Amino acid sequence: MPLSRRELASAPLWLAGCAARRNAVAPPAPVPMSRVRVAPERVIRTIVGLRPFRPSGFVVRGEKLDQKVVIHNYGHGGAGITLSWGTAQLSLAEAAQVETRQAAVIGCGVVGLSTARLLQQRGYSVTIYTKAMPPDTTSNVAGGLWSPVTAYDHERVTPEFRRQFGEAGRFAFRRFQSLVGDGYGVRWLPVYSLSRDSAHQPPPPESANSEIEPLYPDSRQLARTEHCFDVPYVYRRYSMLIEPAVYLNALLRDFLAAKGDLVVREFRDTPDLMSLRETLLFNCTGLGSRELFHDDELIPIRGQFVVPVAAAGDRLHDPRSGRHLHVSAPRWRVVGRQSRARRVRHAGGPGHYGSNPARERGGLRRHANSYNGQGGPLW
């Protein structure tokens, strides 16, 4: 359902890292926001997923294996949706010298689907091979805010990665703008970054994120009279929010409509991949690349989403807090928590993959307490 001007202006969402249209218009005056109604007893569902993180950043490069060329495109961390079109574009550039018009894409998450669609638009005949399809992919439990977050460790960034990161971010920024609308589940929202300690500071010039920061439209620190958050520092920019369930289904629909083939198949190892008939392969397997291609730098990081009961007028947001990055999306009524990278030796084990009730309760309280325009505790 389309948002009214009033709803769009008041829909709060926290997270840095999005590019938005230059002609986005900020609301001329603060709009009253209703209280956030979140509490442990209102939680109806908790979703946990693992993101494929590499401290040195994502991998986009070609490799010759036997008689095949494998183009790797994985390791996006918490920025898979955000960078998907951009790294797909980079991966196609890697394949430009391969003399074939038939390609296999391994993986059917957002990176695999984006890569497959760009291949089709360049005239390739494409088959996706995957062990899981939407709604059962890691991409389906993504937060969906356009934001290059948890994509790399600052200390590990190389000049080449910085070039790729900036190029991928700018391409993806332009591409997502063309998909705004109900059909793809993409829309614009204001983004509020909250702090009790200091005003927003732009990324330092040596940071890879400094390549993305100039894309944000109408970004500025808000005066205390321009918002109703219970914090002294509020920084606003505009971002795109992508609904994974709608978006991934739309990409899959487009792929099949363009006569793409899809085969459900799990690969045990690299030699198993070599049995495919295609000579050009795009590896978009995310965490699967750790086993398939022996990338020991690939680390699973846990993302946890808490879904409270939706209530009319609720608007969710979130501040930065210590070790964890908080995300919230008003359309889902989701309170999310993205933990820092941690090595998971047995991905899926109860100690690593399950939800954390203590974090869930703490996150809910932080949400409620920081959004308190009328004073006093909310619950």
Model regions: which residues?
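Active-site substrate-recognition segment that forms the wall
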Residues: N23-D66, G75, I81-L83, Q89, ...
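N-terminal secretory signal peptides and thylakoid transit peptides that target proteins
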Residues: M1-A16
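Beta1/beta-strand and adjacent pyrophosphate-binding region of the FAD-binding site
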Residues: R101-G109
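Glycine-rich active-site loop/strand segments that organize a redox cofactor
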Residues: M133-A168, R224
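Internal hydrophobic alpha-helix adjacent to the cofactor/substrate pocket in enzyme cavities
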Residues: Q89-Q97
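Predominantly flavin-linked oxidoreductase catalytic cores and closely associated redox partners
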Residues: S239-A310
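Bacterial signal peptide processing site
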Residues: A19-A20
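Flavin (FAD/FMN) cofactor-binding and adjacent substrate-gating region
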Residues: A11-L15, V48-Q67, S139-V141, F171-D254
